[in-house]
Amino acid sequence: EIYKGQYFSKYKKSRAKKVMVFDLDETLGSFVDLEILWSLIERYTKSFHINFDELLDIFPEFLRYGILSILEYIANKKKNGECYKLFVYTNNQCGKKWTERIINYLNNKITSDFRLFDQIVNAFKINNVKIELNRTTHKKTYDDFINCTILPKTTTIFFVDDVSYKDMKKERIYYIKPMPYKHPLSTNEIINRFIYSKYGIILLPRDCTRYAFKAEYIELCMKNGTYHLYTNTTKTMLENDILISQKLMYHIKEYFLLTNKQNKTCKRKSVSFSFTRKRNN
């Protein structure tokens, strides 16, 4: 689903600030099973520290296919001054620290020269406790976003969320709603990959502790409704994930082209959307 505000109906020379806004869950990636695993690990770790970034590196499938290439493109736009800021606008219910861990991972993964994501707009409430003071509702709205970020209302916004919010469909918003991203890993594949990683070997040195840890993780996934018996991937699903990321990159490039203050003609430039997936070894 694509929504372009009236502002983007034609090419124009614009000095308005351009910002990018991403939802977290099922947009940047699929992180529910990772949160369950991390919570369990924290209960087991006593005498040593597990690096969260290194843990997530074990599971590159938790990130949406192609998202690192997309974020690298945005980082270059920030570096050359075309993109003013990059935000996360989330309703994640696991707390600020959890969201910060994922965003810090992405910051560290993309660039060490500057902070890629400028601000996280967190959930309105978690367990009925108000978290983001300048939000007024759990729904995502343009007014709440502006109040939280203190951006001028002349700002143009490229917004990506796998959920449709009618109050984010405004004149200066270019809104992309991709299909929700679901990682393809089975529950057994997740837990076995961790158990036999360098951290798993240290944390769970004996067969009995490995068995107990695995059983507890599976039970938590079942309670949470995220237990997957089989690996959920096919050639068609992979092709669909690739296509979604290609289309997302295309629309991001078009967004900058439509609002480029250097563009002095209305001649349409070709927009390439090829990319290669960044793999973690």
PLM features per residue range, with description:
Residues 1-128:
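Alpha-helical substrate-recognition element adjacent to the catalytic core
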